[in-house]
């Protein structure tokens, strides 16, 4: 069985984005057409379906590296921030975009929060989380997409036919 680990991201992510759009798992918010995706970007994304592509990339990262949190995802999707004459520094991606996408994926039942422990807060007990991991339904969707693009992958990358 082909899994998400066997397919390169350049083939897998567009196919997963299309499957998620058909599945109605995520939808682009109204404000998403006006925002940048990271502090190191100068303009909003040019693609009309960039929200689905980002959500697919987030789901792939959770499937491969989960449990993973919003901060680690923001660092992974960030880039190189141009500081002019000073040296470039790492720029992180928008946590609001990542958090909203994760909330939509949670509502669709594709990811879930991983509770770690309960600590005592000012207002009572507070649940702490280690990030999000993929659910069985999310794993089924991801593996189904990986299996559907297997032939295309084998034609582009001949060495992958052993998987």
Language-model-detected regions and their locations in the chain:
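Short amphipathic alpha-helical elements of helix-turn-helix/winged-helix folds
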Residues: 57-65, 76, 101
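Basic amphipathic alpha-helical segments that dock to polyanions
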Residues: 73, 98-108
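Residue-level detection of the helix-turn-helix DNA-binding "recognition helix"
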Residues: 78, 103, 143, 147
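A short, conserved structural fragment
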Residues: 106-123
